[in-house]
Swiss-Prot record:
It comes from Bordetella parapertussis (strain 12822 / ATCC BAA-587 / NCTC 13253). It is found in: Cytoplasm. This is Beta-hexosaminidase. PROSITE patterns: GLYCOSYL_HYDROL_F3. Plays a role in peptidoglycan recycling by cleaving the terminal beta-1,4-linked N-acetylglucosamine (GlcNAc) from peptide-linked peptidoglycan fragments, giving rise to free GlcNAc, anhydro-N-acetylmuramic acid and anhydro-N-acetylmuramic acid-linked peptides. The gene is nagZ.
Length: 353
């Protein structure tokens, strides 16, 4: 009698993205990643010591399931760049590209494409599938949490530069994720610690802040993350929990058919929806495809124990479309690529001023 090798079940990506505590997977984390409700893992600076360790971690995460989980990170450039040492390129804050646009629009677009390429190529060489970038918020000069993460105050400039950045990401096989729909730039409060309120009417928001989402669409921006901001003249709930915003405006009115990620459900801006189960149910009910639960493994486990949801086939297919379509070169091969070398030199010029 021949012995049969035990194989992992083929689980489709679930609607919950979780994180991990350190630089290797614990037994509890391996168990959590095998939960059918899990569809992805978000990494933070605490998960990185060097490239070798990061590659080992991403390999372990991908091997946890027969159909690999989506591995994501907030890696925009400037102050939001989780991996900074051991060869990772220092990328400029996106506001620097906006300043360059004011002097030379074509040079700014070229540099944005090169920035996207370097960002994605380095992450993919280490096994990361997606960066939650670019920021599409308009720079009104009032939001400290957004600040120089925003390209520009003009929606048309934001659209052009984010399109160029997305092209660079795509050249390295990575999808783009625009955030924070419909716009976080007009409010001063930080949704990590407060519940921001934007008092403007819908027409004004659609004309200005949400315009890049309408102009870009899901072919250029395959994923979107709504803001934990309340727009009381539109809906009493934050955008990420609002069926009006996600299903009626983003999907139906703007015709968007990409992945919609909730922002982190443990943020203060999400507290208005209730406990962790209520927050997840509200986000998924509004039309989000995947919800993020960060920095609270206890809440992640609570949600995975309590959430009862049938993940729609359309959501599963959208998430699968975010996975890279071709294999990435390893780090050493990438370093010897002349195109990458040139793109990296351009970043160093703008970072150093």
């Amino acid at each position: 009698m021949s012995s049969k090798k035990k194989t992992k079940p083929v689980l489709p990506p679930g609607p919950v993205m979780v994180d991990v505590a350190g630089t290797t997977l614990t037994k509890d984390e391996k168990r959590r990643l095998r939960n059918p409700l899990v569809g992805g893992v978000i990494l933070f600076a605490r998960n990185f010591t060097d490239r070798r360790q990061l590659c080992a971690l991403t390999r372990a995460i991908h091997k946890a399931r027969k159909e690999p989980l989506l591995i994501a990170v907030d890696h925009e450039g400037g102050r939001v760049q989780r991996f900074r040492d051991d060869g990772f390129t220092a990328l400029p804050p996106m506001q620097e590209l906006g300043k360059l646009w004011d002097r030379d629009p074509l040079a700014a677009m070229r540099l944005a494409t090169e920035a996207g390429y370097v960002l994605a190529a380095e992450l993919r060489a280490c096994g990361v599938d997606l960066s939650f970038t670019p920021v599409l918020d308009l720079d009104y000069g009032v939001s400290k949490v957004i600040g120089n993460r925003a390209f520009h105050h003009d929606a048309r400039v934001v659209t052009m530069l984010s399109r160029a950045l997305a092209q660079g990401l795509a050249l390295a096989g990575m999808a783009a994720c625009g955030k924070h729909f419909p716009g976080h730039g007009f409010v001063g409060a930080d949704s990590h610690h407060e519940i921001p309120v934007d008092p403007r009417p819908l027409a004004r928001i659609l004309k200005d802040d949400a315009a890049p989402y309408a102009w870009l669409g899901d072919l250029v921006m395959p994923a979107v993350m709504p803001a934990h901001v309340i727009y009381p003249k539109v809906d009493a709930q934050p955008a990420g929990f609002s069926r009006r915003w996600v299903s009626e405006i983003l999907r139906e009115r703007l015709g968007y058919d990409g992945v919609v990620f909730s922002d982190d459900l443990t943020m203060e801006g999400a507290s208005v929806a209730g406990d962790i189960l209520a927050r997840a149910e509200a986000a998924l009910g509004a039309g989000c495809d995947m919800v993020l639960v960060c920095n609270r493994p206890d809440l992640a486990d609570e949600l995975l124990d309590r959430l009862q949801v049938q993940h729609p086939a359309a959501s599963v297919e959208r998430i699968r479309r975010l996975m890279p379509r071709f294999a990435a070169p390893d780090w050493d091969t990438l370093q010897n690529d002349s195109r990458y070398q040139h793109a990296r030199r351009l970043q160093s010029q703008i970072v150093s001023g």
